[in-house]
A protein has these predicted regions:
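Charged, amphipathic alpha-helical linker segments immediately N-terminal to NTP-binding catalytic cores
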Residues: 1-40
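Post-Walker A helix-loop "phosphate-sensing" segment adjacent to the P-loop in P-loop NTPases
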Residues: 72-82
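Conserved nucleotide-sensing/catalytic segment adjacent to the nucleotide-binding pocket
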Residues: 82-84, 91-140
């Protein structure tokens, strides 16, 4: 059961628009609020005495960058910390399970080398040391390289969509593990009617990130979206209540950054059929949102994962 729970907030878009009249102050307040949450998470980890932090969240929740932010906060508080990505435990595309329609099931935990994950986590728990595999994403297979890890008496943060799945941590005693679920907790309304939900924001984050930094067209991202949501329901959200800490990864001023970029995607990329309908419907939800300049993004903002590239 989550011991640190954050209820969702419903914010009037008119209230956001008033705050957006002072964009620098709104951005600073949003960034400061997130930094406080990260520091609090680091404090709770230290208090728990756990060696291993398992951190998950749905797609585009900011789990990867948040893991690195928490690691920095731990280091600033005097605790050595390293981040391990479960992506490096992928078996390789040839071993991926398939969905009923024949497409690869990227969200399935069987894409990972579960026995090796268990072994590495047990070694980290017992000795503070292990050797990690390195995945070659361009070749879509495990490389010949390996990465030695030494916690030096500190903490490792293991991030990935399956991090809270108990199959991964079955060989580690419970006291050595602290579990974090990262997710957005702020939604937006007009006269009390919800207009923009967290799923809308995550779709925008993922689409803009993939187009700006991963070379993936919005059409491809939008085509995969239903599969992504289905995978979250089947493999991620069921373990949410097992977390010790719910990390809120919302930024109020992000609403204006998205509003600024929605039209760019429509002008620069070709979208057809269902993809065009999905993007246009999402864009309509933001039509009353005052846009904000990307220049407001600090160099070290977590949001640079999503809006730091050129769309």
């Amino acid at each position: 059961m989550i011991t640190i729970w954050v209820p969702k907030r419903l914010v009037e878009i008119d209230l956001y628009n008033v705050a957006a009249c002072s964009p620098q102050q709104l951005a600073q307040l949003s960034e400061h609020s997130y930094a406080q949450r990260v520091n609090y998470a680091a404090e709770k980890i230290r208090m728990s005495g756990a060696k291993i932090v398992m951190l998950t969240g749905p797609s585009a929740s900011g789990k990867t960058t948040s893991a690195h932010c928490i690691a920095r906060a731990l280091q600033q508080q005097g605790t050595p910390a390293q981040v391990i990505s479960l992506d490096n435990f992928f078996k390789g595309a040839e071993f991926y399970p398939r969905l009923p329609d024949g497409t690869l099931d990227y969200e399935n935990p069987d894409t990972l080398d579960l026995p090796l994950i268990k072994q590495c986590l047990r070694e980290l728990s017992e000795t503070g040391k292990t050797t990690l595999p390195v995945y070659d994403f361009s070749a879509e297979k495990r490389s010949d390289k390996a990465e030695p890890i030494d916690l030096q008496g500190g903490v490792c943060l293991v991030e990935g969509i399956h991090a809270l799945n108990p199959e991964l941590t079955g060989l580690v005693k419970g006291d050595d593990i602290y579990r974090i679920y990262a997710g957005l907790r702020e939604e937006y309304c007009i006269d009390g009617r919800r207009v923009i939900n967290t799923q809308d924001i995550r779709l925008c984050r993922r689409t803009l990130r993939d187009a700006g930094t991963r070379g993936r067209s919005p059409a491809k991202t939008l085509t995969m979206w239903d599969h992504v949501l289905d995978g979250e329901t089947r493999y991620i959200k069921g373990f949410k209540t097992t977390a010790d800490f719910l990390l809120d990864t919302s930024f109020t001023y992000e609403l204006g950054l998205i509003s600024n970029l929605l039209g760019v995607v429509r002008r620069q990329f070709t979208l057809e059929g269902h993809n065009a309908e999905l993007w246009d419907e999402t864009a309509r939800r933001f039509e009353h949102v005052a846009p904000l300049s990307l220049d407001l993004l600090p160099p070290d903002s977590m949001l640079r994962e999503f809006y730091g590239g050129k769309v």
